[in-house]
């Protein structure tokens, strides 16, 4: 049986690979992509997600989520991912559009309506998931696990201690980490070693 996942991201080159891999893995049922600000503004990360979904020929919804973190101001990472958040490739003109639901509504509806538990994979700040949990805590009963790219068991990449995705919205991370959901963390100690051939 395919594993049902929702991919919550802020594309970004790293998240582009996540979309490519999740969207083409025969063992995964990618229900949809929810987008937050992070690597760039929400307008740019959302457009990047749409471009990737169209380019890869995926038939899944892309839902815009939180424009800002729960408390602090948005901080982007244009020094790494460029002005567009996905510099280095020119996509053809967009012919698809966003799903009308917000990321939070999509997360809630998908999880509550599923007969099987859903895995939520976050590769950016966890704002959308945290807000969905606060909006409807019942979703916690039907989440298999949260798999996140974030945090670190050693040093940070934004400050000596802080990793970017957690740094962007620490309050969202706090909500997710303190929920009843099983958490699998893929931190900097892992992501710094990944080789893509």
Where are these regions (language model features)?
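N-terminal acidic, glycine/proline-rich low-complexity segments
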Residues: 1-197
